Protein backbone atom coordinates (compact mmCIF):
# COMPACT_ATOMS: atom_id res chain seq x y z
CA UNK A 1 0.00 0.00 0.00
CA UNK A 2 2.76 2.36 1.05
CA UNK A 3 4.82 1.51 -2.03
CA UNK A 4 1.81 2.00 -4.25
CA UNK A 5 1.13 5.39 -2.70
CA UNK A 6 4.72 6.46 -3.18
CA UNK A 7 4.49 5.52 -6.84
CA UNK A 8 1.57 7.89 -7.23
CA UNK A 9 2.73 11.44 -7.71
CA UNK A 10 1.65 14.07 -5.23
CA UNK A 11 -0.07 17.07 -6.77
CA UNK A 12 0.58 20.70 -5.88
CA UNK A 13 -1.32 23.82 -6.92
CA UNK A 14 0.73 26.99 -7.43
CA UNK A 15 -1.17 30.21 -6.73
CA UNK A 16 0.55 33.15 -8.44
CA UNK A 17 -0.29 36.49 -6.84
CA UNK A 18 2.63 38.53 -8.21
CA UNK A 19 5.78 39.89 -6.62
CA UNK A 20 9.44 39.90 -7.58
CA UNK A 21 9.46 36.14 -8.20
CA UNK A 22 7.04 36.69 -11.12
CA UNK A 23 9.21 39.30 -12.84
CA UNK A 24 11.57 39.06 -15.78
CA UNK A 25 14.35 41.39 -16.89
CA UNK A 26 14.18 43.17 -20.24
CA UNK A 27 17.57 42.39 -21.84
CA UNK A 28 17.76 45.72 -23.69
CA UNK A 29 17.13 48.18 -20.85
CA UNK A 30 17.20 45.87 -17.77
CA UNK A 31 13.77 47.03 -16.62
CA UNK A 32 11.54 44.52 -14.83
CA UNK A 33 8.18 43.41 -16.19
CA UNK A 34 5.65 40.78 -15.01
CA UNK A 35 5.85 37.31 -16.57
CA UNK A 36 2.94 34.96 -17.05
CA UNK A 37 2.85 31.62 -15.24
CA UNK A 38 4.23 29.64 -18.16
CA UNK A 39 7.18 32.03 -18.54
CA UNK A 40 8.03 31.86 -14.82
CA UNK A 41 8.03 28.05 -14.84
CA UNK A 42 10.12 27.98 -18.04
CA UNK A 43 13.00 29.52 -16.06
CA UNK A 44 12.96 26.50 -13.71
CA UNK A 45 13.21 23.35 -15.87
CA UNK A 46 14.34 21.43 -12.75
CA UNK A 47 10.69 21.29 -11.66
CA UNK A 48 10.26 18.44 -14.13
CA UNK A 49 12.67 16.40 -12.00
CA UNK A 50 10.33 16.59 -9.01
CA UNK A 51 8.02 13.61 -8.67
CA UNK A 52 5.08 16.01 -8.44
CA UNK A 53 2.15 16.97 -10.64
CA UNK A 54 2.08 20.76 -10.77
CA UNK A 55 -0.88 22.91 -11.77
CA UNK A 56 -1.31 26.65 -11.39
CA UNK A 57 -3.82 29.47 -11.06
CA UNK A 58 -2.99 33.14 -11.24
CA UNK A 59 -4.27 36.50 -10.08
CA UNK A 60 -5.32 38.61 -13.04
CA UNK A 61 -3.68 41.02 -13.08
CA UNK A 62 -0.73 40.06 -10.90
CA UNK A 63 -0.29 42.54 -8.07
CA UNK A 64 2.59 44.20 -6.26
CA UNK A 65 2.50 42.92 -2.69
CA UNK A 66 2.47 46.50 -1.40
CA UNK A 67 -1.10 46.65 -2.78
CA UNK A 68 -2.28 43.52 -0.92
CA UNK A 69 -5.49 43.92 1.04
CA UNK A 70 -7.94 41.59 2.81
CA UNK A 71 -9.96 40.98 -0.38
CA UNK A 72 -6.80 39.43 -1.88
CA UNK A 73 -6.50 37.10 1.12
CA UNK A 74 -10.08 36.02 0.45
CA UNK A 75 -9.13 35.33 -3.18
CA UNK A 76 -6.14 33.17 -2.17
CA UNK A 77 -8.28 31.25 0.33
CA UNK A 78 -10.96 30.81 -2.33
CA UNK A 79 -8.53 29.03 -4.65
CA UNK A 80 -7.50 26.73 -1.79
CA UNK A 81 -11.10 26.00 -0.79
CA UNK A 82 -12.21 25.26 -4.37
CA UNK A 83 -9.29 22.94 -5.08
CA UNK A 84 -8.78 21.52 -1.58
CA UNK A 85 -9.76 17.96 -2.48
CA UNK A 86 -7.87 17.99 -5.79
CA UNK A 87 -4.36 18.68 -4.49
CA UNK A 88 -2.03 17.45 -1.76
CA UNK A 89 -0.58 20.88 -1.09
CA UNK A 90 -0.55 24.52 -2.15
CA UNK A 91 2.26 26.99 -2.85
CA UNK A 92 1.50 30.71 -2.90
CA UNK A 93 3.94 32.86 -4.87
CA UNK A 94 3.86 36.29 -3.29
CA UNK A 95 5.87 39.50 -3.06
CA UNK A 96 8.11 39.62 -0.01
CA UNK A 97 7.06 43.00 1.41
CA UNK A 98 3.72 41.82 2.81
CA UNK A 99 4.17 38.06 2.65
CA UNK A 100 4.25 37.71 6.45
CA UNK A 101 0.91 39.55 6.73
CA UNK A 102 -0.71 37.31 4.11
CA UNK A 103 0.67 34.09 5.60
CA UNK A 104 -0.65 35.12 9.02
CA UNK A 105 -4.06 36.02 7.59
CA UNK A 106 -4.40 32.68 5.78
CA UNK A 107 -3.49 30.81 8.96
CA UNK A 108 -6.50 32.34 10.72
CA UNK A 109 -8.83 31.91 7.74
CA UNK A 110 -8.16 28.20 7.17
CA UNK A 111 -9.69 26.34 10.12
CA UNK A 112 -9.17 22.57 10.19
CA UNK A 113 -6.33 22.73 7.64
CA UNK A 114 -4.66 19.36 7.06
CA UNK A 115 -2.61 20.17 3.97
CA UNK A 116 0.44 22.40 3.45
CA UNK A 117 -0.09 25.99 2.32
CA UNK A 118 3.40 27.34 1.71
CA UNK A 119 4.18 30.95 0.88
CA UNK A 120 7.37 31.74 -0.98
CA UNK A 121 8.89 34.37 -3.21
CA UNK A 122 12.30 35.80 -3.99
CA UNK A 123 14.52 38.83 -3.54
CA UNK A 124 15.67 38.71 -7.17
CA UNK A 125 13.34 38.07 -10.14
CA UNK A 126 13.20 34.55 -11.52
CA UNK A 127 14.67 35.77 -14.82
CA UNK A 128 17.82 37.20 -13.23
CA UNK A 129 21.02 35.14 -13.22
CA UNK A 130 21.65 34.87 -9.46
CA UNK A 131 18.00 34.68 -8.50
CA UNK A 132 16.99 32.94 -5.28
CA UNK A 133 13.62 32.16 -6.88
CA UNK A 134 14.64 28.76 -8.17
CA UNK A 135 15.75 27.24 -4.86
CA UNK A 136 12.85 28.77 -2.91
CA UNK A 137 10.18 27.54 -5.31
CA UNK A 138 11.61 24.05 -5.81
CA UNK A 139 11.92 23.51 -2.05
CA UNK A 140 8.45 24.94 -1.38
CA UNK A 141 6.89 22.55 -3.90
CA UNK A 142 8.87 19.61 -2.53
CA UNK A 143 7.66 20.37 1.01
CA UNK A 144 4.06 20.96 -0.11
CA UNK A 145 4.09 17.52 -1.73
CA UNK A 146 5.82 15.66 1.11
CA UNK A 147 3.91 12.93 2.97
CA UNK A 148 4.80 10.57 5.80
CA UNK A 149 4.47 6.77 5.73
CA UNK A 150 0.79 7.08 6.68
CA UNK A 151 0.14 9.23 3.63
CA UNK A 152 -0.37 12.38 5.72
CA UNK A 153 1.12 15.76 4.87
CA UNK A 154 4.47 16.32 6.57
CA UNK A 155 3.71 20.00 7.24
CA UNK A 156 -0.08 20.48 7.40
CA UNK A 157 -0.09 24.18 8.23
CA UNK A 158 0.38 27.62 6.69
CA UNK A 159 4.12 28.14 6.41
CA UNK A 160 6.67 30.39 4.75
CA UNK A 161 9.66 29.02 2.85
CA UNK A 162 12.72 31.22 2.32
CA UNK A 163 16.46 30.59 2.00
CA UNK A 164 16.47 27.04 3.30
CA UNK A 165 14.06 27.59 6.20
CA UNK A 166 10.42 26.62 6.49
CA UNK A 167 8.80 28.70 9.23
CA UNK A 168 5.30 28.94 10.66
CA UNK A 169 3.65 31.63 8.56
CA UNK A 170 2.13 33.61 11.41
CA UNK A 171 5.47 33.76 13.24
CA UNK A 172 7.48 35.31 10.42
CA UNK A 173 8.64 38.82 9.73
CA UNK A 174 10.65 40.31 6.88
CA UNK A 175 13.95 41.15 8.51
CA UNK A 176 16.09 42.32 5.60
CA UNK A 177 15.32 44.20 2.38
CA UNK A 178 18.46 43.01 0.56
CA UNK A 179 19.73 39.66 1.86
CA UNK A 180 18.44 36.38 0.45
CA UNK A 181 17.90 35.39 4.08
CA UNK A 182 15.05 37.89 4.18
CA UNK A 183 12.68 36.31 6.71
CA UNK A 184 12.99 35.25 10.31
CA UNK A 185 10.85 33.62 12.97
CA UNK A 186 12.35 35.12 16.11
CA UNK A 187 9.98 33.65 18.68
CA UNK A 188 9.29 30.20 17.27
CA UNK A 189 11.72 27.57 15.92
CA UNK A 190 11.87 26.43 12.30
CA UNK A 191 9.58 23.67 11.05
CA UNK A 192 12.02 22.35 8.45
CA UNK A 193 15.64 23.10 7.57
CA UNK A 194 16.47 22.48 3.91
CA UNK A 195 20.15 21.70 3.59
CA UNK A 196 21.70 18.66 1.94
CA UNK A 197 18.72 16.85 3.48
CA UNK A 198 15.29 18.07 4.49
CA UNK A 199 15.34 18.04 8.30
CA UNK A 200 11.83 18.05 9.77
CA UNK A 201 11.40 19.29 13.35
CA UNK A 202 8.19 17.35 13.91
CA UNK A 203 7.64 18.55 17.49
CA UNK A 204 7.37 22.12 16.13
CA UNK A 205 4.75 21.22 13.51
CA UNK A 206 1.05 21.56 14.34
CA UNK A 207 -1.38 18.79 13.37
CA UNK A 208 -5.15 19.07 13.39
CA UNK A 209 -7.36 16.25 14.70
CA UNK A 210 -7.92 13.40 12.22
CA UNK A 211 -11.57 14.31 11.73
CA UNK A 212 -10.90 18.03 11.14
CA UNK A 213 -12.73 19.52 8.17
CA UNK A 214 -11.59 22.64 6.33
CA UNK A 215 -13.71 25.70 7.09
CA UNK A 216 -12.79 28.99 5.47
CA UNK A 217 -13.57 32.33 7.14
CA UNK A 218 -13.86 35.18 4.65
CA UNK A 219 -14.79 38.20 6.76
CA UNK A 220 -12.27 40.84 7.76
CA UNK A 221 -12.83 44.24 9.33
CA UNK A 222 -9.96 46.58 8.52
CA UNK A 223 -11.07 49.43 10.82
CA UNK A 224 -7.82 49.23 12.76
CA UNK A 225 -4.69 51.31 13.09
CA UNK A 226 -1.08 50.65 14.16
CA UNK A 227 0.21 53.28 16.60
CA UNK A 228 3.93 53.24 17.32
CA UNK A 229 4.97 54.78 20.62
CA UNK A 230 8.10 56.95 20.49
CA UNK A 231 9.89 59.30 22.90
CA UNK A 232 8.07 62.64 22.85
CA UNK A 233 4.80 61.37 21.39
CA UNK A 234 2.18 64.08 21.89
CA UNK A 235 -1.26 63.77 23.48
CA UNK A 236 -2.84 65.38 20.40
CA UNK A 237 -1.36 62.67 18.17
CA UNK A 238 -2.70 59.79 20.27
CA UNK A 239 -6.05 61.54 20.73
CA UNK A 240 -6.36 62.07 16.95
CA UNK A 241 -5.70 58.38 16.26
CA UNK A 242 -8.24 57.18 18.81
CA UNK A 243 -10.79 59.68 17.43
CA UNK A 244 -10.82 58.19 13.89
CA UNK A 245 -14.44 57.63 12.87
CA UNK A 246 -15.39 53.95 12.82
CA UNK A 247 -12.17 52.80 14.52
CA UNK A 248 -12.57 49.42 16.23
CA UNK A 249 -9.04 48.49 17.31
CA UNK A 250 -5.49 49.76 17.78
CA UNK A 251 -2.25 47.78 17.70
CA UNK A 252 -0.07 49.71 20.15
CA UNK A 253 3.62 49.16 19.38
CA UNK A 254 5.39 49.67 22.69
CA UNK A 255 8.94 49.67 24.03
CA UNK A 256 10.67 46.52 25.27
CA UNK A 257 8.44 44.16 27.20
CA UNK A 258 5.32 46.25 26.58
CA UNK A 259 6.18 49.59 28.12
CA UNK A 260 4.85 53.07 27.31
CA UNK A 261 5.14 56.57 28.81
CA UNK A 262 3.65 56.67 32.31
CA UNK A 263 2.01 60.07 31.70
CA UNK A 264 -1.56 60.08 32.97
CA UNK A 265 -2.89 61.56 29.70
CA UNK A 266 -1.98 58.36 27.81
CA UNK A 267 -3.78 56.16 30.33
CA UNK A 268 -6.81 58.47 30.21
CA UNK A 269 -7.09 58.46 26.39
CA UNK A 270 -6.79 54.67 26.17
CA UNK A 271 -9.18 54.12 29.10
CA UNK A 272 -11.77 56.34 27.41
CA UNK A 273 -11.30 54.42 24.13
CA UNK A 274 -11.67 51.07 25.93
CA UNK A 275 -14.90 52.26 27.55
CA UNK A 276 -16.22 53.25 24.11
CA UNK A 277 -15.55 49.73 22.74
CA UNK A 278 -12.18 50.20 21.02
CA UNK A 279 -9.78 47.28 21.53
CA UNK A 280 -6.09 48.07 22.16
CA UNK A 281 -3.50 45.31 21.79
CA UNK A 282 0.02 45.69 23.17
CA UNK A 283 2.76 44.45 20.81
CA UNK A 284 6.47 45.02 21.37
CA UNK A 285 8.60 47.00 18.92
CA UNK A 286 11.38 44.45 19.50
CA UNK A 287 11.77 41.76 16.88
CA UNK A 288 12.17 39.06 19.52
CA UNK A 289 10.81 38.57 23.01
CA UNK A 290 7.43 39.07 24.58
CA UNK A 291 5.13 41.66 26.12
CA UNK A 292 4.97 41.19 29.91
CA UNK A 293 2.51 43.77 31.16
CA UNK A 294 3.01 44.68 34.81
CA UNK A 295 6.66 43.61 34.78
CA UNK A 296 7.70 47.28 34.87
CA UNK A 297 5.86 50.31 36.24
CA UNK A 298 5.77 51.65 32.66
CA UNK A 299 3.15 49.07 31.66
CA UNK A 300 0.96 49.07 34.79
CA UNK A 301 -1.11 51.99 33.46
CA UNK A 302 -1.81 50.04 30.26
CA UNK A 303 -3.34 47.22 32.32
CA UNK A 304 -5.51 49.77 34.14
CA UNK A 305 -6.58 51.21 30.76
CA UNK A 306 -7.85 47.80 29.59
CA UNK A 307 -5.09 47.03 27.08
CA UNK A 308 -4.80 43.40 25.90
CA UNK A 309 -1.36 41.74 25.96
CA UNK A 310 -0.19 40.48 22.57
CA UNK A 311 2.45 38.34 24.32
CA UNK A 312 5.09 37.40 21.70
CA UNK A 313 2.91 37.89 18.60
CA UNK A 314 4.48 39.65 15.60
CA UNK A 315 3.08 42.95 14.37
CA UNK A 316 2.05 41.25 11.12
CA UNK A 317 0.14 38.48 12.88
CA UNK A 318 -1.45 40.97 15.29
CA UNK A 319 -2.79 43.06 12.39
CA UNK A 320 -4.14 40.01 10.54
CA UNK A 321 -5.63 38.43 13.67
CA UNK A 322 -7.35 41.64 14.76
CA UNK A 323 -8.93 42.13 11.32
CA UNK A 324 -10.01 38.49 11.37
CA UNK A 325 -11.52 38.60 14.88
CA UNK A 326 -13.28 41.91 14.21
CA UNK A 327 -14.79 40.30 11.11
CA UNK A 328 -15.93 37.32 13.18
CA UNK A 329 -17.23 38.97 16.36
CA UNK A 330 -19.44 42.01 16.97
CA UNK A 331 -18.65 42.07 20.68
CA UNK A 332 -15.56 43.91 21.90
CA UNK A 333 -15.28 41.49 24.82
CA UNK A 334 -15.18 38.50 22.45
CA UNK A 335 -12.42 40.13 20.40
CA UNK A 336 -10.38 40.97 23.52
CA UNK A 337 -10.77 37.46 24.92
CA UNK A 338 -9.73 35.72 21.69
CA UNK A 339 -6.92 38.19 20.96
CA UNK A 340 -5.26 37.18 24.23
CA UNK A 341 -5.10 33.45 23.45
CA UNK A 342 -3.43 31.46 20.64
CA UNK A 343 -5.57 30.47 17.68
CA UNK A 344 -3.06 28.98 15.25
CA UNK A 345 0.17 28.84 17.23
CA UNK A 346 0.80 32.55 16.58
CA UNK A 347 1.74 33.29 20.19
CA UNK A 348 3.11 31.59 23.28
CA UNK A 349 1.47 32.35 26.61
Each model region followed by its residue ranges:
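Accessory alpha-helical/coil subdomains and C-terminal extensions
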Residues: 8-11, 15-21, 37-48, 168-257, ...
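Short glycine/serine/threonine-rich phosphate/pyrophosphate-binding segments
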Residues: 23-24, 98-103, 133-137, 259-262
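Short beta-strand segments
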Residues: 15-17, 92-94, 118-121, 159-163, ...
